[in-house]
Amino acid sequence: IQTPTEPEIELFEVDFSKSPSNFTEEDVNSKYAILIDAETGVVISHRSGNAKIYPASMTKVMTILVAVENIKDFNATFEMTYEIIKPLVDADATRAGFKEGEDVKIIDLLYGLILPSGGDCAIALAEYISGSEEEFVKLMNKKCEELGLENTHFSNTSGLHDENNYSTPADMAIIMKYAMENPICREVLSTYKYTTEKTEENPEGIELFSTMFSRMYGNEVEGVDIVAGKTGYTTEAGNCLVSYATKGEKSYICVLADGESKWKSIYDTFAVYEKYIPFDVTTDISVNDEGSDEISEE
């Protein structure tokens, strides 16, 4: 894979001024939710769309974006270490399944980061690029500054709970927007199944499956193609899901946080795309009091 030239993108902002409605409790279980037009940034509907959330593994969308922008050779390899694997096992964190001493291709780390939500891959990419996770996180926060994300801060690459690893639904939508503008990020985030290269430790390679797509058949919402996404979960964050969908020539981003279960997050996603996309958001409709675009500590 060739390193892509970074596309020149004007600063993308989420526009709450035309939001005609807030999600009903009947339609959306998640405590926090937002649906935006991915081209204009206009908010179609939301629930506390600018409130503080813990993004859990949605963090990895920023991780892959920063990683891809800093990788020169996607066919290079990184040796997986005991020091990376052991703390994740102790924390019962998700891993792609690479083994100690295994030489893993960088491209395989990217797929392992997103599809099974591998914390091992997150730290491996950070160490490969920056020498340590701490140094890589500095790049993530620098990227937040570049994108104008004043309400987002990262403290780790995987989304494990930390008081200083936070965002908002609106900011996560912006991060997803930029990730989908990058062809390699888009390809990885859009993949259902991927097999890593064969190694001595994994002679058949590792079959990786998307935690999002494995919960979908693909035809649940007529006329809508959910093309990419990333799940997340911690006890504090609840169930989270950021997704990117198209309907005709239009594209949309939905972010959900603090849902009751992984399945309810999927059902919420279907409901959002099925019931809220048809709204005409070109007219000047004010957000009601519940839809305030002020940052809050909810």
Which residues does each predicted region cover?
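Penicillin-recognizing serine hydrolase domain
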Residues: 8-32, 132-297
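Active-site-adjacent loops and short helices of periplasmic peptidoglycan-processing enzymes
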Residues: 3-170, 179-180, 247
